Every structure is written in structure tokens, then in C-alpha cells.
Amino acid sequence: MSMLMAVKTTSLCCSSLNLTASPTFRRNPRAARLVNPTARIQTRFHRLIEEQGIVLMPGCYDALSAAIVQQTGFSAGFISGYALSASLLGKPDFGLLTPPEMAATARSVCASAPNIPIIADADTGGGNALNIQRTVKDLIAAGAAGCFLEDQAWPKKCGHMRGKQVIPAEEHAAKIASARDAIGDSDFFLVARTDVRATSAKSGLEDAIARVNLYMEAGADASFVEAPRDDDELKEIGKRTKGYRVCNMIEGGVTPLHTPDELKEMGFHLIVHPLTALYASTRALVDVLKTLKENGSTRDHLQKMATFEEFNSLVDLDSWFELEARYSNLRNALGTTKS
């Protein structure tokens, strides 16, 4: 029985999921090579995790925020679908962002922060196991070093919002396997995410652990259980899930905030702060515009703003003046001097 036939003929209920006895997936003739073949492939993220033990990734949503992430010394960054939906569309994370929009942003973000690897949020991958191949290849072409791929039903929502639904586990495992095939030998780190925890207060955590372990067998590099409720759940995830583990730190979300060292102790490897920059910049923008509206001037707000010189340094203005001078005439451009 093929993988896609198994998906069509297998009905899994989130509240009664039993992935330890999942014959349709395990009998698949590809199963032998689906057991996380990337264990032998050293991507940039594999190396970062092995070198640092734990990697802290702030979120970014455009070229400028990515440049700031790099210049402030972080070793990696993350393009948040939530943040991009807000900044690009002015809309909530409600399934409105498309894969081509994420890929286009990934291209500008990676160009703006070329010295650090960037993971992109692929959401549900733009469709089924076939659609995900284009999504992954587009992100690789854009320069991304990895992506998150989640098992929500479309239209998806932010992982910390109510009303989420998930697709059958084996269907998402097939999408992970398809993504792995699309990656091939590319330097690309695949994170499998499950949102099933929020669908059942009684069995959601157990189902989540079973799901991400299945997704690891299908070819993921790391597992991501979204929205654990407390430290006990975090510790269970750290103990019982396979491979590298991702933890999402959202200010105001349902998961308690922790430092990287605290999460490392619980068994995590990649710590994402996807909305920190977005929330901070939003508050700063609201504050300065209120000041301008009320006072008609920003002269009493200058200490809370970047200066003209600071901002020009951030976007590397001096290097552009140097290029302008170099190409001002042919002799300079060719590096020749008058004899």
C-alpha cells in the first residue's frame, strides 16, 4: 500500500491516536530510507546546535529587522508567518499569507543578513504533499536555511490562538517525506511542527509527542510541539520526543517564558522568539506617533529614537559612498592610475 493510499484509507482521531501501532506507515516500502536520513547530513543548523548546545533565534519580518538581528550578534534568525502577515498584509495570522509571499520575503531577508542562517515559517506548506515540494524548493532558492512545516488544517491560525484543527498524522508524515525528497542534498533544516496539543485538553500532549516522533521518522531534522501549557509539559516533551527539539517563546502566549539555559536543561535545542521584535517595534511606533500627534514635534522623544547617524550606519551607508566614488569614472572602476 502506498503512502498516499494509506493517507486516504486511514482515519485517525486526535483523541484516540495510536501511532505506536501504525502499520500503514511502517509497511511503506520507503520506510527504511525515511528514518531521518539527515542524521548524516551536517546542515548549518546541525553545526550550530552541536557547537552551541542551544541556539536562540529572534524573529524578523523584513530586510531591516533581519539586518538588526545579524548586527546584534545572533547566530540565526527566523521569519515568522505571524509577523509577516502583520507587516506585509496588515492582517492576523489566519491563513492569509501565501507561500510565494514568504519566499519573496525570505530572499530579501537572507540577502540582508547573509552571515547567519535563516529559518522560514512554511506554515502548512501551501497544500498537500505535492504542493510542499514547490514551497520547499522556492525557500531553498531564496536562500533560507530551513523551514517549519506544521500539521494544521487549512486555513491555519497562530499556534497560540483558539479554534485550531489538525490533519491526520500520516497525511502530515507524507508531507514531511515529500519535503525531505525536495530538499535532497541541499543545506536545509526541516522542522516538523504539531499543533494537536490545543485540540484536546485530555490527550493533546500524548498525541503531540506521538505525532512529532512519527514526523521524525518521516525525515524531519527537528520536532516542534507547539503551545505546551506549563513546565511539566515542557519537561515531558524534552524527555519523550526524538531528535533536536524546538521551543517557541511568545510573549503573552500560553507557554511560560524561559531562558535558553532553562530550556536546555529541559532538553531543547532551538529557542525561537518569533514576535519579540514585532511587538517591541509596534509599541515604539505607536508611542512616537502618539507623541507626534499630541505635540506636533518629536523633540522630546529623540532619546527613544535611533539617530540619523546610527540608522545610516545600520544600513551601511558608508560602503555605498565608497562604491559611488569607485565607479565615478572608468579609471577608478578599473583600479588604474594615470601614468
From Swiss-Prot:
Catalytic reaction list: 1-carboxyvinyl carboxyphosphonate + H(+) = 3-(hydrohydroxyphosphoryl)pyruvate + CO2
GO molecular function, one term: oxo-acid-lyase activity
Keyword check for Transit peptide: yes
Subcellular location: Plastid, Chloroplast
Known EC number: 2.7.8.23
Matches recorded under PROSITE patterns: ISOCITRATE_LYASE
Annotated Pfam families: PEP_mutase
An example Gene Ontology CC term for this record: chloroplast
Stretch forming the transit peptide: 1-30
Predominant localisation class: plastid
Entry keywords, A to Z: Chloroplast, Plastid, Transferase, Transit peptide
Family membership noted in the UniProt record: Belongs to the isocitrate lyase/PEP mutase superfamily.
PANTHER family (alphabetical): CARBOXYVINYL-CARBOXYPHOSPHONATE PHOSPHORYLMUTASE, CHLOROPLASTIC, PHOSPHOENOLPYRUVATE CARBOXYLASE
Name of the protein this chain belongs to: Carboxyvinyl-carboxyphosphonate phosphorylmutase, chloroplastic
Organism: Arabidopsis thaliana (Mouse-ear cress)
